[in-house]
Regions:
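Preference for protein termini
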Residues: 14, 66, 73, 128, ...
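Phosphate-binding site of ATP-dependent enzymes
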Residues: 113-199, 220-227
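Active-site nucleotide/adenylate-binding loops and adjacent lid/helix of ATP-dependent enzymes
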Residues: 9-10, 50-141, 152
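Residue-level detector of anion-binding/catalytic polar loops
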Residues: 39, 67, 253
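ATP-binding N-terminal substructure of ATP-dependent carboxylate-amine bond-forming enzymes
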Residues: 1-46, 50-52, 56, 74-87, ...
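Short alpha-helical
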Residues: 24, 143, 238
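ATP-dependent carboxylate activation and anion-phosphoryl transfer catalytic cores
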Residues: 190-268
Length: 268
């Protein structure tokens, strides 16, 4: 709250959170507004801090029967010896990914081909400021992304699916923000596969108690099984971003959607 020029007390009706990374996707802003009793447009501080923590969110998704990559968590200060490294590689064989456990935009992510590259890749991931790092199994397949937004009755609905064809080895920072990828909306896939992806996106949204607009990234592995790569509680919303492309394809007016999100946040 604040005092205006007339000396009257003013307050915010709602906070529309569009900050990527910390403090918008790790729960800090959400906790601040919760303490002030000001409504906001994402999930709760607990919800977004869970989706920001890849290891924790994957654990919950796996327990619910959703497919995710195998992963091993390394806390900052935990120095790996050769025996421990060999044990990890038995669980997660090469090639694999090393990535920050907290963070987004694919910053600090490395595709590791040899054992000698693992420790430098872990150091690279820790330089992003993350308190922990994941060694994660490599999933091979086509990548897709789908937004989930509130429908007319505020119940979540899945958007048309985007296929991502990256010019790089994976959908990294350059591919996401510098145009080094081709995006096809609506993805040219079977109705059966589209239904699986959209249903799993909605399951993840509800399981992790998301609110507002969210983007769920998938990779489809053998036998048309969609595995969840990441859940973005504050998805990109520029003209280049995936969710606005999906909204346009679905015929959803952006102004109408934002009004709906604000109204449902105030009513929550």
């Amino acid at each position: 709250t604040w005092l205006n020029s007339s000396g009257d007390t003013q307050t915010f009706d709602v906070a529309f959170i569009m900050v990527h990374g910390t403090p918008g996707e790790d729960g800090l802003l959400q906790k601040y507004f919760e303490n002030l009793n000001i409504p906001f447009t994402t999930g709760s501080s607990d919800s977004v801090s869970t989706t920001f923590n890849k290891y924790l969110s994957n654990h919950k998704l796996r327990q619910a029967g959703l497919l995710v990559a195998k992963s091993y968590l390394i806390e900052k200060g935990n120095l790996l010896d050769q025996d421990e490294l060999n044990n990890i590689l038995q669980l997660i064989p090469l090639p694999c990914f090393v990535k920050p456990n907290h963070g987004g935009s694919s910053l600090g992510v490395s595709k590791v081909l040899t054992k000698d590259d693992i420790l430098p890749s872990i150091d690279h991931a820790f330089k992003t400021g993350t308190p922990s790092v994941l060694i994660e199994s490599l999933l091979i397949g086509k990548e897709y992304s789908v937004g989930v937004v509130p429908g007319d009755d505020s119940s979540p609905i899945a958007m048309p699916i985007t296929e991502i064809i990256s010019e790089n080895e994976f959908f990294d920072y350059e591919a996401k923000y510098e145009g080094a990828s081709q995006e096809i909306t609506s993805a040219e896939i079977s109705i059966e596969l589209a239904d699986k992806i959209q249903l799993n996106a909605l399951k993840a949204y509800n399981l992790l108690e998301c609110r507002g607009m969210v983007r769920v990234d998938f990779i489809v592995v053998e036998e048309n099984c969609p595995a969840i790569l990441e859940i973005n509680s504050v998805p990109g919303f520029t003209k280049m971003s995936l969710l606005p492309q999906q909204l346009a394809h679905a015929g959803i007016n952006v102004r109408d959607l934002l009004s709906r999100i604000i109204e449902s946040s105030i009513a929550h």
